[in-house]
């Protein structure tokens, strides 16, 4: 996190595929999308991420044509599709339930859309088999859905969605019904398939890890509004506000008070009772309240014994959890605040552990912190 870990931002050369401008949507008189503008680029894997009820699925359904906008405009490849019926939008959707026809074989499920489009009969078999090969199911063509695993059914749904070569594929929480191991496998397969096909994917999820793993770009939503739009690394390491910081992964939030500005980048501040320098990229005044944000893996801890003195935030180990590659500890500061620390095991160093109630000093690399204004005291 913070300044020293920022990426070099490269200008995007991608061309817009979908443009939503001034979108507004109400249900039963309640405004769920108040004013939304969003551009989705050709060939990217974009994820709409947010808690239940944030409006992400509504945005997906508006793009698909399954809901109509109350105001605003939707463009697809520079064509206004705001009032174009769903079946004429060259957009396909994969739902959480997959919605396979149980009485049809895998082949017939995938061929269904082609038959509905009156595709010439001679083209159907090669196109269906090509789609099944893409998802590694060509040998399952004559099976029925009930003879497939959940992951295989999911891949059939994707094959059915891509067989007619849509410009855009929408996926609505389409991995959430799978078990953990299969979900991880399908995340990798979906991303690889998207690269292979070159089709733009828009994926809806509330699972932060899923979004970070699969996406070229993440749009974080709350209450029908976009809170932040950026790459997974930007969203994780440079959250724009406390909502994004708290929603994406674990994060520690320390209270701070400005003492003085030292230079263009650094501020001297009191952070949870300890004076230190922090990097602040906006104007501040002495006495102003701030939040200093640090991921558990960005903290450094040192055991304090009776015969040594250590600088930093002082606390005591209250919980520790071995996670294989990491040791996660909960440290209670002297003021009562709980801090999560994640330490990685290095195979070249001896293993370590901390006893409960062990006294600890917590520090971090200067400039790795993200500093935000206190939203209650702006």
Swiss-Prot record:
- Give the UniProt keywords, A-Z: ATP-binding, Cell inner membrane, Cell membrane, Membrane, Nucleotide-binding, Translocase, Transport
The EC number on file is 7.6.2.11
- The highest taxon in the source lineage is Bacteria
| Effect after changing residue 54 to T | Loss of ATPase activity and transport
Identify the PROSITE patterns for this entry.
ABC_TRANSPORTER_1, ABC_TRANSPORTER_2, POTA
Which effect does the record note for changing residue 45 to L? Lower ATPase activity and transport efficiency
Q: Does the keyword field hold Membrane?
A: yes
* UniProt topology in membrane: Peripheral membrane protein
Q: Activity regulation here?
A: Strongly inhibited by carbonyl cyanide m-chlorophenylhydrazone (CCCP), and by spermidine via its interaction with the C-terminus. Also inhibited by N-ethylmaleimide and p-chloromercuribenzoic acid. Partially inhibited by KCN.
Similarity remark? Belongs to the ABC transporter superfamily. Spermidine/putrescine importer (TC 3.A.1.11.1) family.
Protein name in the entry: Spermidine/putrescine import ATP-binding protein PotA
Q: Which organism is it from?
A: Escherichia coli (strain K12)
Encoded by which gene?
Answer: potA
């Amino acid at each position: 996190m913070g300044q020293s870990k920022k990426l070099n931002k490269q200008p995007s050369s991608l061309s817009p595929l979908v443009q939503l401008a001034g979108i507004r949507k109400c249900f039963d008189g309640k405004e769920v999308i108040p004013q939304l503008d969003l551009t989705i680029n050709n060939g990217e894997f974009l994820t709409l991420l947010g808690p239940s009820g944030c409006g992400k699925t509504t945005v997906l359904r508006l793009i698909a044509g399954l809901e109509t906008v109350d105001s605003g405009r939707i463009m697809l490849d520079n064509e206004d599709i705001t009032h174009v019926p769903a079946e004429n939008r060259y957009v396909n959707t994969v739902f959480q339930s997959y919605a396979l026809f149980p009485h049809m074989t895998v082949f017939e499920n995938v061929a269904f859309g082609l038959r509905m489009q009156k595709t010439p009969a001679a083209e159907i078999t090669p196109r269906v088999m090509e789609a099944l090969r893409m998802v590694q199911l060509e040998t399952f063509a004559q099976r029925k859905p009930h003879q497939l695993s959940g992951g295989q059914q999911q891949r059939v749904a994707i094959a059915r969605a891509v067989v007619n070569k849509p410009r855009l594929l929408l996926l609505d929480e389409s991995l959430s019904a799978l078990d953990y191991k299969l979900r991880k496998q399908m995340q990798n397969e979906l991303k690889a398939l998207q690269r292979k096909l070159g089709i733009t994917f828009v994926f809806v999820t509330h699972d932060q890890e899923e979004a970070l793993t699969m996406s070229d770009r993440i749009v974080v939503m709350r209450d029908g509004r976009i809170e932040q739009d950026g790459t997974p690394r930007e969203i994780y390491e440079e959250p724009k506000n406390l909502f994004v910081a708290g929603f994406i992964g674990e994060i520690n939030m320390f209270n701070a008070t400005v003492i003085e500005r030292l230079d263009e980048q650094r501020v001297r501040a009191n952070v949870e009772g300890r004076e230190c320098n922090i990097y602040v990229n906006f104007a501040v005044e002495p006495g102003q309240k701030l939040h200093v944000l640090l991921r558990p893996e960005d903290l450094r801890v040192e055991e304090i014994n009776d015969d040594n003195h250590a600088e930093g935030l002082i606390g005591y180990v209250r919980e520790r959890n071995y996670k294989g590659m990491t040791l996660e500890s909960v440290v209670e500061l002297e003021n009562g605040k709980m801090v999560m620390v994640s330490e990685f095991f290095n195979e070249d160093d001896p293993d370590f552990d901390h006893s409960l109630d062990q006294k600890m000093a917590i520090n971090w690399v200067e400039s790795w912190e993200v500093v935000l204004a206190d939203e209650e005291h702006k």
